[in-house]
Curated annotation (Swiss-Prot):
Lineage, broadest ranks: Bacteria, Bacillati, Cyanobacteriota, Cyanophyceae, Nostocales
Record carries keyword Lipoprotein: yes
UniProt signal peptide: 1-21
A Pfam family per the record: bMG10
Subcellular location as annotated: Cell membrane
S-diacylglycerol cysteine lipid attachment residues: 22
Protein family: Belongs to the protease inhibitor I39 (alpha-2-macroglobulin) family. Bacterial alpha-2-macroglobulin subfamily.
The protein, known as: Alpha-2-macroglobulin homolog
Covalently attached lipid (N-palmitoyl cysteine), positions: 22
SMART domains named among the record's database cross-references: A2M, A2M_N_2
Length: 1906
């Protein structure tokens, strides 16, 4: 009997395990080798089975799928026994984690928990007895096998044995590595791996290990967790014996290697060859950089020399062991030796041409293996001749007319001894349209030729006679120079390199400075020779039109003459003439200024960003458009649904530099919800103070998240504010933390004191305080010394010391005075400044917690060294450094002796032993090259140090008496020298302007110090904002002139000083060459103006500090200005519950900061003098999902009596009397709390102030509810109240409880309870057992009495239903009647769910967004975007014509015209298209792509496309087809074949359909990416002789498609390019299946999946939009005539609905039948169709589950795990099944809830819902009352959006690729009891039938020790 029972249990257990797919609890099982499977021949399918997949070789993400012609099951609930029995007829061997499920009634798929393992053969069996509803039946098993990719070993050490070259030599104890595509069985690798010496049969064995870095990590990428084949499996090999030197080996992996998890062993050898190192030897001298298309990098015709050795060298030893004789030129970096290299390069510029050198290699040259050369090697080297070259200055160069500078063309060894050149005199007006020489000159073929004669290897300078060419002493010349310099080979042809240089040279004596503001301009002209201002210079201003298409004769928009100071001012009217027609309010003007004096002229051009950066300010541009400086703020910013919110708007704005109030103006108010949807809130009118106020009720159904409230005025002004809707239960107590030190040092103790009080005044006596103390590195800078560097720095490759961030965690109880204390010691391991953060969390009797934090800075020393210097210096020049010594507060310390060292940084690589193998490691050395000592004073000390050569240096400063480095300070500088490092030219034109302060008060005098490099100069000095406020022109002398100016209110809130310094003095032709760098320096420095006069002082005085709930409070308000004078004004006053405010820390905004926010310095400027040449030149979330909250609509009332209100009073406009006084009276709600009165004042004159005060409401005896926020039916809770005794007396406390409604006491009397107990002096909790009886609302009332004082409250407690719904769908396409079986179980819950039926005549949706996107994205002049926009315009025109859709503001023909114009400009002479303007050769990829757009456009828009354009393109593509290898980037076969396929497809579009090269292309099919394979299949389908091959590709593609009830998604492997995006793959697959005339329902699913890839109605990019719309148009052509049919829906003979589909006006019908109207049992749903057209249908049956539910994985998989916060041990993990034993958690603790979601295919719009049990509350980390010390584990970033509700967590992902994803959040156990914990659920938002759910479980929350 016992045996029989055991056998029965075993059978049941086996059945359960089978249903679970070898996965009992829905949790991953361990990995083990899989049993072998013999291959089977693909079976012949019976007619009623349509398709099996996959067959042959499958990818890891392929779906196992079986499709049937007829339904196997009716549309019914997922848990019907018949379904489960049918699924037993599907088997997979070996069993993999997962289970079979019905995708639709006609399709079954395997839902895998992991990707299919690599190197595995699997067998799928459909068992005998499997039948459909039409009684087709299998009378025997039907099986087939498929296998995944075989084991592939790559990156083998050494080289391929068939290669002639040897591998890099290896060490005798090498650490070798190889890569596998799958995890391997290590024992089998060791068994089948040998290293065989050359000529031997036996070899060495290896120790094989998986590389540490490759072992799976906790935070692994989602795809790698799901599909291990996505990882690199790298293995380390270590020979078991030492190898022999100078020996060749073969590394052989023989057949038979097993995967760690799989069943297919390797069936072939993997071999490589390698060799050990030989004695170090010199091999040969090589040459690099010979003349080619890019010039002569190696300088000489034969190239630059390199010394090649057989082993890798130690770089430092090479530099000391190579000698060259005769000695080369002394230039830096004569030798170039890279780490891990065996080649030494010699700098060719150190060598002379046609000269023989002797190179001696010393015997001590060392290689990486520690060997030396042993004996010196000497070799001769002849440089040979210099390669031909030509050089001439490019771009614009200005030569001062009085200085004899020349334009030289420098040539050397030109092969033909000639060059070509062209010259043209430039007129001033030419510059309106042209900015470069190449625009002004004829084509190079028309240029004149000039002979050059000179000696070989000697540079010849040809001087261009400028004045002769210009025919004047001044003027401008455009020139172009070209010469043949060398021949080179390309594609078998010999070509000439012909470099072409264009330039402009100007002879002038005029320096021109032009500056523009929104309403004015300034032009200054000085002579270049001596800087004297030019009086009466003629000024002409033109609009700069470099992009103009037509070029009429230019006319100046403004003219004038300079005054005595050389200045011409442009007024507003003149400037408006110059900006007419441009967007003046948005963009700065683009202007050309011509200044002339007699025949001499010069120019400056102002472009959009001229002078914006690099001169001391980041200039803006405000224009004349008003800019908002106002705001909308609320009473408390944080709300719950069902509450009311108040808002006040301040409508201030900045226009033309003036701040104004928008009084008596109408504003349209709009609410923007978290999803971006907008709701109008009507119109508000501002009052005489420029403000308005409004009340807004927050609906009960309002979504959680962040909302924006916007107000738009008629003048375009917009102000806005933000608020948040959340669910929360605010704690009614607070915590304060105080530290006894702000700064601490090593060894110091810091005292922490924490205090906690209830908001109604009583102490939180006996509460638990938890201390969390952490630290992190801080970049500490004493206040006021922000420009200095402090403390040690660790420069690469050094790393800062790592020390633990955790300092201390401790618990303590609050004493009778509500206090707790803790001491922390600053540890001795402190290597750098650290911020110590102290978090204190207090929990009271209700188990709610509040946290607060403070921090202090721990420093290694109380003396801080500050260091300031530039980061770039010149070699050999003194480099200034400023030093200070300060204490942490910023006060300077004097008399401290410090040593400064300038240390050269030397980098090197050393070899260190890691795990027994040699690993290179970077290291750094510091060599002191200069040092000095100084003593600190009360001012910064300046010292100079000189770096001897270029390179990287460290400045190290430390105390002279220091015993360690703790107090040192470091900084890094870069030193430039004679090498090619070039740090930019603009810096030499920047003038340093220093102000004595950063902020001034109005009326103060500011001093500016000008750092002048000139002995004599003219200074233009100004203070500017959007215009010059102060201006001065003065002559200055010496290196540090000073300017003083008075700060005025007009400069509020900020301005900038500007200085333009023009060099004056003796003429420049009398100045020594090289002594003058430039003729002008320009600089700006911003400053702020103090705003204290803009503040009002506001006093708020409540009449009573403490009063009872429900009483009236009187509040006095008083307004004064900053000087204390009474001021009349307006007050916005609110009285808010502090419990809500402390969650967010909200206070109304500081309006002075808002209104007087920093204003842009609106200016642009240019100067022509930086281009002046002074000496000859040498050859040169959705926020929509928000986050937060955690409590229900009633939760706001959980701390209330009967009238809880978070807001007691709000008035947006309280007016004061003339003395600034006002009084309000507030009727208070019943809350026991602290009320905060907050007020914002304004006086109507742009002055503002804030004030607040608090008072409390309390009682002698008071009680507060201790209730959960909700309960579910069946929950048993311990809840009640807390009682605070403020009477000061003890006695008999009486508590009476009453409950009604859906909750009962769990006692003999279910409605009332009483308790008599002795009163305590502190706050005590009293809990009573209760039970949730039914869904609804229970009312809980408690009354307390003590010695004649009493308190009572009544609160609702909501009993929430658990709503678990499931959905089944059936979709399809029909030309006739169709019957769908439906089975509604008689026990189905009747009040929820039902049947939804959607019928449609087309699935093409309304398309508008791509049209809008083209309008915003049409500014790129490239071929691909232009071709994509042309395709979009063409397709939209087709859709518009067919479906009657209209696109506002989008004219298809006009947009097509614009795109064709762009493409015409990009077609070049060979007929192809350049990818971008200026590209010299056509791009074959974009040329082929553009064909489709042009052909489609010519069909839809007749005569739009020039036939010649298509003809030239056709000729070009024929050449590409014939010779794809002519492109340098396309030498590999794969690229050639892909290019040929693209050319064939394009030629076919052009009417030239060919089958040439198809055999070669088809051979590469397996190497093509998925999108190219789809294109190939579609192209092959056009040819009868290629049909089989096309179908094979389609069959393979079908395996890459994952199908569900309504979608078919192409699974795309990770790709490199945008041309293979998921949208492209989906669109191309849809086009292929249309071309192959596949089943209509498959085509519909592909279309639905393509539509699902849209975001905001668009596919994101022009390319994706073009691809998708092309597929949509081809889909639309499946129905050539508009539909005209009648569709009728019947169920069980009853007509549900009927619709006539005529044309595309109303293309869809939706019917819904509620569950209580559906007939029970089995019936047919009949869809009848009569007429012409196609009927698309979707039937969805959804129903609610009853009772406790097991989990279910129906398309998605989810598991839930619970652990203590910050702990690794998992307390419980739940999948499909839950343990019978309840989970018990301790009360008052914090736990981490982790959800793991597995997705086996790409999905869109995924929703995660995790219900909370009533005993737990989610922790909202965004609240300020939450401690940052407790952190949830890391989430997958793809699950970024979440909301916290009182009873659930909702998260969302927009798109997920296959993978394993995790979501974590924290909960706190607050209510003791026994609770239902429903399963976590994941589903697709728009396909809820695809879901996963964990099993429901029981939770017990109990106090510790119970």
């Amino acid at each position: 009997m016992i045996i029989r029972v055991c056998i029965r249990c075993f059978i049941v257990l086996t059945l359960v395990l089978g249903i679970g797919g070898c996965n009992f609890f829905g949790i991953n099982s361990g990995r083990e080798p899989l049993p072998a499977v013999s291959p089977l021949t693909p079976p012949k399918l019976p007619d009623w089975i349509e398709q099996i997949s996959p067959i042959g070789e499958a990818q890891p993400l392929n779906q196992i799928r079986i499709r049937f012609k007829e339904a196997l099951i009716p549309v019914e609930s997922l848990d019907s026994p018949e379904q489960q029995q049918l699924l037993q007829k599907f088997a997979l061997w070996p069993p993999l984690p997962g289970q079979f499920r019905f995708l639709t009634p006609r399709m079954v798929g395997f839902q895998a928990d992991k990707a299919l393992p690599i190197a595995t053969r699997l067998q799928v069996t459909l068992k005998a007895g499997l039948a459909d509803l039409k009684n087709h039946r299998l009378d025997k098993d039907l099986s087939w096998t498929f296998n995944t990719q075989s084991i592939n070993l790559t990156n083998l050490p050494g080289v391929n044995p068939i290669e002639k070259a040897d591998a890099e030599p290896i060490d005798l104890q090498p650490k070798l590595q190889f890569t596998s595509n799958v995890e391997l069985d290590l024992a089998s690798v060791q068994e089948h791996l040998q290293l065989i010496p050359e000529g031997k049969n036996e070899g060495l064995r290896f120790q094989v290990t998986l590389n540490k870095e490759e072992k799976p990590l906790d935070k692994e990428e989602p795809l790698k967790k799901f599909d291990p084949s996505a990882r690199n499996w790298i293995y380390n090999l270590r020979p078991q014996k030492n190898l022999k030197t100078a020996t060749r080996y073969r590394l052989v992996f023989s057949p038979g290697i097993r995967p760690a998890y799989g069943n297919l062993v390797t069936d072939r050898e993997f071999v490589s060859k390698l060799s050990t190192y030989s004695p170090l030897a010199f091999q040969k001298i090589n040459f690099y950089g010979q003349p080619d298309a890019g010039g002569t990098y190696g300088r000489f015709i034969k190239g630059s020399p390199q010394l090649e050795f057989n082993n890798i060298l130690v770089a430092e030893s090479a530099k000391t062991n190579i000698k060259i004789n005769p000695a080369p030129k002394d230039i830096s970096r004569l030798l170039q030796v890279n780490d891990e290299d065996r080649i030494i390069g010699i700098n060719p510029y150190a060598l002379e041409p046609a000269k023989t050198y002797t190179i001696t290699i010393g015997e001590n040259l060392q290689d990486k293996f520690g060997q030396t050369l042993g004996k010196p090697v000497s070799l001769k080297y002849d440089t040979g001749d210099l390669a031909g070259d030509i050089w001439v200055p490019s771009d614009l160069n200005i030569f001062p007319a009085g200085k004899d500078l020349r334009l030289n063309i420098s040539t050397v060894n030109l092969p033909e001894s000639k060059y070509q050149a062209a010259y043209r005199v430039v007129k001033p007006t030419d510059l309106v349209y042209f900015n470069y020489g190449n625009d002004l000159l004829p084509k190079p073929a028309e240029w004149k030729s000039f002979q050059v004669s000179g000696k070989k290897n000697q540079s010849v300078d040809v001087t261009v006679p400028l004045r002769e060419k210009i025919n004047a002493k001044t003027g401008m010349l455009a020139y172009g120079v070209q010469a043949r310099t060398n021949k080179y080979q390309e594609n078998g042809k010999e070509l000439w390199r012909e470099p072409t240089t264009y330039g402009l040279v100007e002879l002038t004596n005029l320096g021109v400075f032009s500056q523009w503001f929104p309403e004015s301009g300034l032009i200054r002209v000085n002579h270049l020779t001596d800087g004297a201002p030019v009086k009466a210079a003629v000024i002409e201003i033109y609009q700069s039109k470099l992009q103009a298409k037509s070029r009429p004769e230019p006319v100046p928009c403004a003219t004038g003459k300079t005054d005595e100071n050389g200045t011409f001012r442009v007024n507003r009217e003149a400037l408006q003439q110059c900006t007419a027609g441009s967007q003046n309010s948005i963009k700065s003007p683009e202007l050309l200024v011509i200044a002339s004096e007699k025949e001499d002229w010069a120019f400056t051009r102002t472009e959009e960003y001229s002078g914006v950066y690099g001169y001391g300010i980041d200039a803006g541009w405000q224009g004349n458009k008003p800019e908002s400086r106002g705001v909308i703020f609320s009473d408390r910013q944080l709300y719950q649904s069902g509450e009311k919110a108040w808002f006040t708007g301040f409508a201030d704005y900045l226009q033309n530099g003036v701040i104004q109030q928008d009084k008596n103006a109408d504003y349209q108010i709009t609410l923007v919800n978290p999803d971006g949807q907008k709701t109008s809130l009507g119109t508000q009118t501002t009052n005489e103070f420029g403000t308005f106020s409004l009340e807004m009720p927050i609906n009960k159904t309002q979504g959680l998240g962040y909302y924006t409230i916007q107000a738009k005025g008629k003048n375009g002004l917009e102000i806005s504010g933000e608020f948040r809707v959340a669910e929360f239960k605010p704690p009614n107590f607070k915590v304060e933390v105080k530290l006894d030190k702000e700064f601490a040092y090593i060894g110091d103790d810091v005292d922490i004191n924490a205090t906690s009080n209830y908001l109604f005044g009583a102490p939180v006596e006996g509460g638990e305080a938890k201390y969390f103390i952490t630290r992190q590195q801080a970049n500490f800078i004493p206040k006021g010394w922000e420009e200095f560097t402090f403390g040690r720095q660790w420069f690469w490759p050094e790393e800062a010391p790592t020390i633990s961030s955790d300092v201390l965690q401790s618990n303590s109880q609050l004493d009778g005075n509500d206090k707790s204390s803790q001491m922390v010691n600053v540890a001795k391991d402190l290597p750098y400044p650290m911020t110590y953060r102290v978090d204190v969390q207090v929990a009271d009797v209700s188990n709610l917690s509040v946290a607060n934090s403070q921090s202090f800075t721990a420093l290694p020393s109380n003396r801080l060294i500050g260091l300031k210097s530039n980061f770039i210096a010149d070699a050999g020049k003194a480099f200034p450094i400023e030093v200070i010594i300060a204490d942490p507060t910023g006060k300077l310390i004097t008399g401290q002796r410090v040593r400064l060292e300038l240390q050269q940084i030397k980098y090197s690589s050393v070899t260190q032993l890691v795990e027994g193998s040699q690993t290179p490691k970077n290291q750094v050395e510091y060599k002191t090259v200069a040092q000095t000592e100084i003593t600190s004073t009360s001012n910064p000390q300046s010292v100079n140090l000189t770096p001897p050569e270029s390179g990287t240096y460290r400045i190290r400063v430390n105390f002279s008496d220091a015993k360690n480095e703790l107090g040192a300070t470091d900084s890094q500088i870069w030193v430039t020298g004679g090498n090619a490092v070039f740090w930019g030219t603009r810096d030499k034109d920047v003038l340093e302007v220093k102000l004595d302060k950063k902020e001034y008060k109005a009326g103060e005098t500011a001093t500016a110090l000008i750092q002048s490099p000139y002995a004599d100069a003219e200074l233009y000095f100004a203070v500017i904002k959007d215009k010059p406020i102060y201006q001065q022109i003065t002559k200055v002398q010496g290196s540090a002139p000073q300017i003083q100016f008075r700060v005025t209110p007009e400069m509020l809130p900020n301005a900038a000083v500007e200085a333009v310094l023009v060099r004056q003095g003796k003429p420049i032709n009398q100045v020594e060459v090289g002594s003058l760098d430039n003729l002008v320096k320009i600089g700006f420095t911003p400053f702020k103006v103090n705003l204290e006069d803009k503040y009002l002082k506001l006093q708020v005085k409540p009449a009573q500090a403490s009063l009872e709930p429900g009483a009236e409070e009187t509040i006095q308000l008083e307004v004064k200005d900053n000087q204390g004078n009474p001021t009349k004004g307006q007050l916005t006053v609110m009285v808010v519950n502090e419990a809500v405010l402390q969650l967010s820390g909200y206070r109304p905004p500081n309006l002075v900061d808002t209104v007087y926010a920093e204003q842009p310095i609106s200016t642009r400027f240019t100067d022509n003098r930086p281009d002046v040449i002074l000496q000859p030149q040498d050859v040169a979330k959705p926020k929509g999902w928000g986050y937060g909250g955690g409590f229900s609509t009633g939760a706001a009332n959980t701390r209330t009596r009967t009238d809880f209100q978070p807001l007691a009073y709000y008035n947006g406009s309280v007016l004061t009397d003339a003395s600034g006084n006002a009084q309000i009276t507030v009727k208070l709600p019943d809350d026991l709390t602290t009320w905060r009165v907050m007020a914002v004042a304004t006086d109507g004159n742009l002055r503002f102030g804030n004030g607040d005060a608090t008072f409390i409401t309390t009682k002698p005896l008071l009680s507060n509810a201790i209730l959960p926020q909700f309960v579910r039916p069946g929950d048993r809770i311990l809840a009640g109240l807390s009682v605070t005794n403020n009477t000061g007396n003890t006695g008999n406390l009486s508590i009476n409880g009453e409950i009604s409604g859906a909750v009962k006491f769990n006692s003999k009397n279910p409605t009332t309870t009483t308790l008599q107990t002795q009163a305590e002096s502190a706050t005590q909790a009293y809990r009573f057992p209760m039970v949730a009886d039914s869904v609804g609302v229970g009312k809980v009332r408690f009354t307390t009495q003590l010695n004649g004082t009493a308190d009572a409250f009544e609160l609702p407690l909501q009993v929430k239903p658990l709503e678990i719904t499931e959905q089944i769908v059936e979709t399809g396409v029909s030309q006739k009647q169709i019957k769908i079986p439906l089975n509604v179980d008689k026990n189905t819950f009747p009040e929820a769910g039902g049947l939804d039926i959607q019928l449609a005549s087309t699935l093409i949706p309304e398309i508008k967004a791509p049209a809008k996107q083209v309008l915003t994205d049409n500014d790129l002049p490239f071929t691909e975007p232009s071709a994509s926009q042309l395709i979009i315009a063409t397709n939209l025109q087709t859709i518009a014509q067919k479906y009657g859709q209209t696109f506002a503001e989008f004219n298809s023909r006009q947009q097509a015209n614009l795109a064709v114009e762009k493409l015409q400009k990009l077609q070049i002479s060979d007929g192809g298209f350049a990818a971008f303007p200026g590209q010299e050769k056509s791009d074959p990829w974009v040329s082929a792509y553009s064909v489709e757009s042009l052909v489609k456009a010519s069909q839809v828009f007749p005569n739009l496309v020039d036939t010649g354009m298509l003809s030239r393109l056709k000729t070009y593509l024929q050449k590409v087809l014939a010779n794809p290898g002519e492109y340098d980037f396309c030498k590999q076969q794969l690229c050639k074949r892909q290019l040929q396929l693209n050319a064939l497809i394009a030629l076919s579009e052009l009417g030239d359909k060919r089958n040439t090269f198809l055999t070669d292309i088809y051979e590469q099919r397996n190497n093509f990416d998925l999108v190219t394979q789809i294109k190939l299949a579609r192209y092959l389908s056009q040819f009868p002789e290629w049909q089989d091959e096309s179908q094979q590709l389609v069959n393979k593609l079908q395996q890459n498609i994952s199908e569900t009830g309504r979608t078919a998604v192409v699974s795309l492997p990770p790709s490199w390019g945008w041309m293979s995006s998921p949208t492209t793959a989906q669109a191309q697959a849809l086009r292929l299946f249309i071309a192959k005339q596949s089943k209509p329902e498959i085509i519909d699913k592909l279309l639905q999946s393509l539509l699902a890839l849209r975001r905001d109605g668009t596919w994101q990019t022009d390319y994706n939009n073009a691809q998708a719309l092309t597929a949509l148009v081809e889909y639309g052509q499946l129905q050539p005539t508009p539909p005209n049919f009648v569709a009728t829906v019947q169920l069980a003979g009853r007509k549900l609905g009927e619709n006539r589909f005529t044309g595309y006006k109303n293309p869809s019908l939706q019917l819904s039948v509620p569950m209580n109207q559906l007939p029970r049992g089995r019936h047919d749903l009949t869809l009848q169709k009569s007429g012409n057209g196609t009927l698309h249908y979707l039937v969805a049956y959804n129903y609610r589950l009853q009772g406790n539910q097991p989990g279910r994985f129906n398309g998605l998989r989810i598991t839930r795990e619970i652990s203590q916060v910050n702990a690794k041990r998992i307390l419980r993990k739940t999948g499909i099944y839950a343990l019978d034993q309840p989970l018990t958690l301790a009360l008052g603790q914090v736990f981490d809830i982790g959800l793991e979601i597995i997705v086996d295919r790409p999905v869109d719009h995924l929703v995660i819902k995790d219900p909370l049990p009533a005993g737990l509350e989610a922790v909202d980390a965004s609240f300020q009352t939450t401690t940052a010390a407790l952190q949830a584990k890391a989430d997958s970033w793809e699950l970024g959006f979440r909301n916290i509700y009182s009873d659930r967590i909702i998260a969302y992902a927009d798109h997920l690729e296959p993978g394993v994803y995790s979501l974590h959040y924290l909960v706190r156990s607050v209510t003791p009891g026994t609770f239902s914990w429903p399963g976590a659920e994941v589903h697709l938002q728009y396909a809820p039938e695809e879901f996963g759910r964990t099993a429901e479980m029981k939770l017990i929350v109990e106090e510790k020790g119970r």
